[in-house]
Amino acid sequence: ESDYAGDNTVLITGQDGDEANLANIVDGKQSMTVYKAVANEAVVTLDLAKAMLAGDTIDESLIEKSGWDFECAYDTESYETSDGNKCPSFLLVPTVVTKDNLQEALVDPGYYTMDDDGYLHPAN
């Protein structure tokens, strides 16, 4: 038996902070989204590839050596390959984006621009 009475508030969330999700947040149709900057994902990928090509040991120390200015965690337990081997991963910490922090989280860093109506558009 459900306790849903039809008048409960349903939270709608999203991932990736794409333009449609952000418009829904501005319009009050969606509560939040999580965002990871593609540029930061590219930086991690490039630094990881450079370290591998140099023959460096790939571990958590890459985070400190690289001097990234964003949060990243090294995870050796959560993911496995199809044959069951652990797959160490560098995971960017996502930013929770709501109507209250659109400007601070996405516009101020230069990821998005905001038009006169308050809607966000990719900066590049």
Task: Name each region found by the language model.
Residues 8, 21-24, 40, 85, ...:
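Detector for Asparagine
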Residues 1-30:
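Venus flytrap/periplasmic-binding-protein-like
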